[in-house]
């Protein structure tokens, strides 16, 4: 169809060019024929000019229309080419579709066979899955039993080791406890002996000084014993008490001599209570600032009235019994030395 249209356009163009040639030839022949008639006839230039202009206009219009027709033909040609390509694709697709439609029955048979095989495979998979689940349960049970046995063995070993450690620890604690009890008994006895000895010496010294001079000089303080560093009796208040204003020394000497003759020991406090008019004793207690400024001294004043307590201390030393309360008391004294000093001070004041 496109080729026929192109042939027609070419034929029209050839006819148009041949017509133009014939027209030009005829005009030339008319000019040649009209030349010999120049003499008898006068030329009409205006008519020829009009005719020529009309021919030119006609030729220009024809040329323009021919050009427009050529452009339209090219456009139609391109569209026809595109349409032909499109319909060619459609034709090929229709041919393929026809072939595929012809293959549909075989495809349906294949699909049916695949469905049957899939159903068979599904049943097989279900059976295999059930067997795998059963196998997994068996494996889990075996693993659980194995872990139970391992944990049981580990627990038994742990119990045995802990029993051994507990027995060893108990034995060690028993030995340490027995050793500490013996040490504490020994240290307590040593402390009691040192305390008794210390108070006896202090009392003897103070008594000798009192018998020789008739009064106590507390200002002359003795250095504390090194062995009494852990059990010093803090009796600073009693140490700083001073006997002042002894107006009647002779009555006191008579009292002491009479006490020595009768072999009886009478407390000076009782003597003062019985004869307040004869013996006037003033106890002067210094201020806390003075006591703080003065250095601590040995507890010599506490032993002035300790003669009657010496047998009691010896009895306590003989009847010492160490128990758990003594152990805790010793540990508390070690942890808080200030508290132990206070307790020793209280004991000393009670003894006084």
Curated annotation (Swiss-Prot):
Coiled coil location: 92-180
GO biological process, one term: retina development in camera-type eye
Post-translational modification Phosphoserine, affected residues: 11, 340, 343
Domain of life: Eukaryota
Motif window: Nuclear export signal: 243-256
Disordered: region residues: 267-352
Function: Component of the BLOC-1 complex, a complex that is required for normal biogenesis of lysosome-related organelles (LRO), such as platelet dense granules and melanosomes. In concert with the AP-3 complex, the BLOC-1 complex is required to target membrane protein cargos into vesicles assembled at cell bodies for delivery into neurites and nerve terminals. The BLOC-1 complex, in association with SNARE proteins, is also proposed to be involved in neurite extension. Associates with the BLOC-2 complex to facilitate the transport of TYRP1 independent of AP-3 function.
Family: Belongs to the dysbindin family.
Protein name: Dysbindin
């Amino acid at each position: 169809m496109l080729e026929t249209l192109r042939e027609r356009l070419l034929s029209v163009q050839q006819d148009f060019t041949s017509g133009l040639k014939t027209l030009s030839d005829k005009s030339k022949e008319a000019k040649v024929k009209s030349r010999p008639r120049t003499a008898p006839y006068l030329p009409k230039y205006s008519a020829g000019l009009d005719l020529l202009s009309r021919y030119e206009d006609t030729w220009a219009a024809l040329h323009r229309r021919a050009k427009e027709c050529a452009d339209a033909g090219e456009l139609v040609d391109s569209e026809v080419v595109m349409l032909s390509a499109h319909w060619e694709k459609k034709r090929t697709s229709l041919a393929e579709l026809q072939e595929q439609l012809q293959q549909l029955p075989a495809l349906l048979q294949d699909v049916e066979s695949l469905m049957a095989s899939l159903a068979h495979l599904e049943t097989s998979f279900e059976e295999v899955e059930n067997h795998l689940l059963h196998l997994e349960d068996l494996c889990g049970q075996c693993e659980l039993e194995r872990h139970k046995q391992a944990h049981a063995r580990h627990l038994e070993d742990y119990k045995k080791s802990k029993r051994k450690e507990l027995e060893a620890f108990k034995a060690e604690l028993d030995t340490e406890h027995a050793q500490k009890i013996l040490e504490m008994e020994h240290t307590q006895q040593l402390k009691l002996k040192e305390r008794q000895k210390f108070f006896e010496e202090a009392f003897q010294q103070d008594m000798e000084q009192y018998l020789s001079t008739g009064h106590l000089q507390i200002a002359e303080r003795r250095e504390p014993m090194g062995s009494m560093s852990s059990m010093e009796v803090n009796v600073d208040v009693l140490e700083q008490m001073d006997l002042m204003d002894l107006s009647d020394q002779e009555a006191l000497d008579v009292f002491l001599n009479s006490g020595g003759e009768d072999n009886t020991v009478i407390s000076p406090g009782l003597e003062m209570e019985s004869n307040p008019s004869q013996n006037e004793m003033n106890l002067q207690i210094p201020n806390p600032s003075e006591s703080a400024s003065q250095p601590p001294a040995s507890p010599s004043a506490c032993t002035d009235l300790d003669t009657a307590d010496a047998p009691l201390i010896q009895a306590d030393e003989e009847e010492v019994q160490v128990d758990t309360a003594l152990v805790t008391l010793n540990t508390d004294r070690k942890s808080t030395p200030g508290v132990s000093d206070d307790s020793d001070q209280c004991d000393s004041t009670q003894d006084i």
